[in-house]
Amino acid sequence: GAGCPLTVAIAGPVTVSGQHHTWLIPLLETGWVAYLSTTDAVCYHDGHRALDGYGGEPIYEVPIFGDDGALRESGTIRVTDMGFDEQVLLDQDRFLTACLLRPEFQKKMTGTELRHLLGGYYAAQEAKNGVTPGLLATCQRLSIPILVGAPGDGSVFLNAMKLWAMRQAGLLPSDGPSFDLDVAAEVFESCAYHHW
């Protein structure tokens, strides 16, 4: 296939483990990849290293067959053999919620547009904290769309659902945040790439 662009599908602890810096981002930078298909969790965990107050590396190795009860008691979240303080998730949620409240997110959009916009915010946060660019920032810079087949499998979309639920419960104004994920348009977008 000369002239045939690649589509790459990844899952698992790619960003939380830092593998994206080792092999995925270099692959994307070759220019051969038309789009990336992944999970919402991969996109969510991509932001942890750029959060304020963690010095660029809040994630550390833990025994994969260790005592999960003891980790839980200490407030440590485990993803395979990687661990981080539970506060990292809470800070990531605050960061995402702040992004989703910004004006450019207040419309109906595909997940590729959502992740492109988030990539810009991840990139700014990474630059601010001197962190190596992550997956969303790299895809945003290279204009590589990121498709997620199951947006509810991670907390990027769950933060959007939190805002929707708060609006429904009267905790936010009824004319408050209006982000709306257009799943049908994203399916058509994916089909268009395959047809191309």
Predicted regions and their residues:
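Conserved catalytic alpha/beta core of Sir2/sirtuin-type deacylases, generalized to analogous enzyme cores
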Residues: 1-10, 16-196
